[in-house]
Amino acid sequence: MIGRRGFLQSTGGAIAAGAALSGVLGRTARAAGNGTANCAGATISDGTLSRFRSRISGTVILPSDSAYGSARLVYNQRFDPYPSIIVRPASESDIARSIEFARINGIRMVVRSGGHSYIGASGGTGMVLDMSSMNAVAPLGDGMFRIGSGARLKRVYGDLRCNGNWTIPCGSCDTVGFGGIAQGGGFGYLQRAAGLTCDRVRSARVVLADGTAVDASPDADADLYWAIRGGGGGSFGVATHFDVEAIPYQTLRVSLWYWPLSVAQQALELMVDLQQSGEIPRTVTAALVFNVGAAALSPPQCVAVLFSTASPSETTAIKQLFVGPNGIPATPGLGYDYDAESPACDPMEVTEHSWYRAKSAMVYGLPASDTGAVIREWMQRRLSDPMLGASNYGSINFLTLGGAVADIAPGDTAFVHRQSLLEVQFLGYLNQASPAGVRANDHWIRGTYADVFPRISLAGSGCYVNYCDDDLLESQWPGLYWGANYPRLQATKRRLDPSDFFHGRQTVRT
């Protein structure tokens, strides 16, 4: 009997050929009148497609189907994918049969949890395995829940709350898919109190490149269990569900205020100082946002937010560290305080499909003498960029780490950036894409990043895999995303997927 490794290696040539052909057609076209379809350069007969469809208990969507127009879309409108075939599996068997079909026909497969990849990685011209139908959230007892990879965060938060008043540290955008955020790490507004999303995962079910389904846990394939907690999605197999240990629901108190953009430098220095000194308790995650261009208030303002599970009086006292006598006075008449129903109730979140480019940086600490210089450099050059017009805008977001995130050692999960103090996200949005708008957007975000990243990387470099960046070179992104953990990720990849069937733009390489 041929083993898994032999089977994968014997089919590697077909996949390589399919990958070479996948760029032939940017948009899948149907051959006229000959009973065949062109799938990413591979000609497949109607009979073959029909037989495949009959074997899938879920849904198969082809370009000729009415559902295709919406099903093909991803969140980032910078990408306009036209996959050859979209499969929404309903079972492990559906996934295994889809893998088999893609292999035999030389079609590249990508996995989509929620479609929020910053670089459009869940689109393409081949097969999209859309996990949105595998979205159940089921209580297992004692605060344990089984969460389907395709469950959107709005459902996750709602179902956990309704089944015993539980929650989980997770993201703020309610349309993100759980499978993607959990495998990349999982930032959120409860992270300092309860850790990353992946820190609550106790086991997962994964369909491998040979079609077999395995458990990943401390007692069953511990290396795979380690890898899917921070290694990113789409590298090792198709995660069907995760068993997670929830935490008791706590009210999330949100306190938002504004500072004039003229004090942006002092505002960021204050956040860095409070974070480095440990004065921000782990019950609080703080954010600082600079919006410029069309999204900015007039006059432009910095947005500061505290996300707190502390008591109302404690939250007020923490806020005074920022705006009190030893802080910076807030802009009068702006800002508000409220209790959020869930961490997905984000006052700054853009939930509709958007055109944007994004970048990230993990800040391990800035030398005090350098902090002001770094801030002034990009403040002066970028927060008043004349190229940002009425149709586009930029945003720089700082979020505090530490707390429970840092309780786990960098090598204990694949998420390596445990000792980072701050996570920085750079976003350039377009309301209406145009060649001029794209140029302006790229000029701003790439220039801003060039100003900032080389300086902060002196104190510890890194980027976040779930904020993937297609400007990074093949020689750069593995080290920036995973650092010293990358060799172990590669070893796990070579063992489970030696032919690199699950190959994406920035997936772990063999």
Language model segments and positions:
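Soluble FAD-dependent oxygen oxidases
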Residues: 2-510
